[in-house]
Amino acid sequence: MPDIRVEVVYALPERQYLRTVSLVVGSTVEDAIKASGLLELRPDIDLEKNKVGIYSRPVKLGDKLNDGDRVEIYRPLIADPKELRRQRAEQAKK
């Protein structure tokens, strides 16, 4: 069976991780993340909590991959985006 090549990325404010992996056709997002080794390298990644996407489009761990996809592991939000916008608007008024 032919292989597909995908990238798996995880970004922190101080460091970015990019791993290219070769997988069999029909592999899933979860397969790529496990093959990348990022789960062992970054114990803070919890696939039950962290959302994932392909090229900024949210996907599920069981979704199939295509050759050339970029799997992105997203960090949980620390603050509520609405609250941050409200605070910035108040700051701008001053």
Curated annotation (Swiss-Prot):
One Pfam family here: Ub-RnfH
Record family assignment: Belongs to the UPF0125 (RnfH) family.
HAMAP family documented for this protein: UPF0125_RnfH (MF_00460)
PANTHER family named in the record: UPF0125 PROTEIN RATB
The protein's name: Protein RnfH
